[in-house]
Amino acid sequence: ATETISPARRVVLVGVDGLGPDLVASGVTKGNLPAFARIIKRGAAGPLATLRPTEGPPVWTTILTGRLPRDHGVKSFATYRLLGSATTYELLPKGALVRLLEQVGLVSTRPVTSTARKRRALWNALNAFGIPTGIVRIWGTYPPERVQGFMLSPYFHVLRDDPVRAADTLYPRDLIAEVKSRSVPAGDVDEALLSEFVDPPLRSGGDDRPWRRDLVERALAPDLTYRRAGSLLRAAYDPPFFATYFYGLDVVGHAFLRFAHPESFGDVRAQETRRYGRVLDRYQALLSQWVGEMERQLRPGEILVVVSGYGMEPVPLWRRLLDGATGGSGMSGTHAGAPDGFLMAVGDGVRPGAVLGSASVLDVAPTLLYLIGLPVARDMEGRVLTEIVDEEFAQAHPVTFIPSYESLAITPITAGGSLEDLPPLPEEGP
């Protein structure tokens, strides 16, 4: 058995996507993101280079393993199978042809699940040293693993109304009734909150933009659900490492970027800008507010780390034209070009005003291990971001190494989670 250690620092990890350096800078300058501004001043911050293909599951599996997709095994948002073939493909080219093949049933897709990851994640390493972990909505965690602590998978909000399968999304299952009582269905999103995004008169008939699907069903309702569920579980278990993820900014970035930055598109009507122009800014402000609440709740010996796995940029004109010609999704924001993400850290031992050196998503796992006080695996690809800690922490906690965490016993997944007929999570656009 591995020795049990006390963590050097307790760590809270908040994951988002679609938040790049430019978005942070403009939001801070406009005064729209006061909590982010405070964290950047009191702590460390900087751009985070990302990976290709720039999709949530491979990028976030890299963030939490410190390994490249070719090593950890998660290479896309889904796996694909051609009709009549037993061969599973991990990557297919994105575009109209593949979309057509899916529509006519010649290609089937299967969501990425926890069985796809071939390398140990942070929670495996921490649990091996006796440190409990709390994991909420991280990509690729369905079915959940039998961790020391708890794990709530990103399928909870999809399966919550199924009395049998809802329980399969949480390990251990003890608090599933309480978690379900905290969930927020799309129809229950507060009207006062909605009015901050879209004017009330515009939410009636005649609005030809499917804003309810993108803003309410795919962004706000799930983010509110996991925020409330995460708060409940964290309070119940109080794990030294807690990780949660908010997907909503990525969703609204894909759908509403054109209205926030009409000058980058040229074909946005003034009426549309009035309707939807503040959705993206308001969503960033909401995330900043939530992160600010978590920062204010930090206790001595705790560090808050906010990570965006990639940014968001306008869909190029040629792709918008192709999309229109082939009946595509009409997205206006994309991260197919691997725009930088962002990292912020604040708390006990973080150096105020620190700026990241050349950093990437590969550096997050080694850095989190270091902050917690565990050795960094030499087979991890990234480096420890030592520039974010103050001199006192650095002197008290030199970086230590271990050859690998891959010799750890595999944490079994829960037996109840059925992988057959698993509904897809809302499709992420590249």
Question: What spans do the regions from the language model cover?
Answer:
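His/Asp/Glu-rich, glycine-adjacent segments
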Residues: 67-270
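A long, amphipathic alpha-helix that forms part
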Residues: 4-7, 22-24, 216-242, 258-306
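Membrane-interface soluble catalytic domains
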Residues: 1-9, 78-114, 119-120, 124-129, ...
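Active-site neighborhood of phospho(di)ester-bond hydrolases with catalytic His/Asp-centered motifs
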Residues: 39, 305-308
